[in-house]
Amino acid sequence: MKNNSVILRNKTTKNLCFYLKEIAVVILFSQILLAQPKISGLASEPGAFSRIGFGARGIGMGNAMSAVTTGNLVSYYNPALTVFQEGNSFQTSYSFLSLDRSLNFVNFTRKFDFYSKKDSLNENREPRSTAGVTLGIINAGVSNIDGRDNNGLKTGELTTSENQFFVGLANKFSKKFALGINAKVFYYRLYDKVHSSGFGLDIGALYVVNDQYTVSFVVSDINSKYKWDTSPIYGQDGTSTTDNFPVLMKAGVGYRNKELKLTASAEFERSNVKTNIVRFGIEYNIYENLFLRGGLDQFDLSNFDSPAKPALGFSYFETFDNIVIGIDYAFMVEQYSPQDRHIVGLNVNF
């Protein structure tokens, strides 16, 4: 009887150890699965190239630009900004990116002041209304893609080209309030005979609280989407699909202190793909025509696994007669890339 009881206890102990090991393995694997980082909701959505930013100045300030009303402005960040542009502003930027990627920007912004004939004799007359217009292009692409057929044989190098063309119009309804709209056309050439185009809208508003503070509200990518048709390549086996861009809603605050020569801004952006992003930016006129910048972009409150993107930059300006020419530079961290982003720009104000 003793031997039987000993054998029974040994079997029970072995079974218990076996089950405990199984439970430990299940717990271990569940912890590994739960520990996987969440993927950024915006990064995997269509039109990612159009959400990187615009130009060296904006990227250097963490893209927190929707409430900034000084310097060279672009309606990309807020269509209402163009009415605050001083002079005629032309900007262009080129980005140095890894993995054979390219990203380029071109923009022209101007405001128009309209006066009343009744004020023609008044030396210090003020405009009765102000309008603004922006024309811009964003171009992105990937080159040197190794093309191969079903047998693995090389067919040549492939390239992609993704573009956004936009026109922004704005009106200043009073000294404190401005409203604007962007009309955007997208064109994406993905492969031979496979391309797509789309149309979208941005609507933005800006309110001047006082000489130091401004607030903004913008809704971006309304109706923006790509429509694809692969039947030119696959014939009857081809399919038609529609990829909708995420709709972005953001609110911003801008601060300017003329005595300290300081400009600061902050934004909160929410999308319909459940991202809640915070941005910060600062610009300091450290010496005459030299400006230093810093910022933080893509700080997602709903996904701390998605890394934020710090940025730095500067601008230097020289005046030639009535023309101001400036050089811009921005650096932004890109965590999952062999190298970080470098953006070099040229701006002309006349």
Identify the meaning behind each predicted range.
Residues K2, R9-K14:
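Charged/polar low-complexity intrinsically disordered segments
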Residues M1-K2, T130:
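A broad structural signal for short, well-ordered beta-strand segments within beta-sheet-rich domains
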Residues F18-Y19, L28, S75, F199:
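Hydrophobic transmembrane-helix microenvironments that flank and shape a buried ionizable site
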Residues S30-I32:
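N-terminal signal peptide c-region/cleavage motif recognized by signal peptidases
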Residues V6, E22-V26:
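Acidic, Ala/Val/Gly-enriched low-complexity intrinsically disordered segments
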Residues Q36-F350:
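Subset of outer-membrane beta-barrel
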Residues T12-E22:
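A cross-taxon signal for low-complexity, glycine/charged-rich
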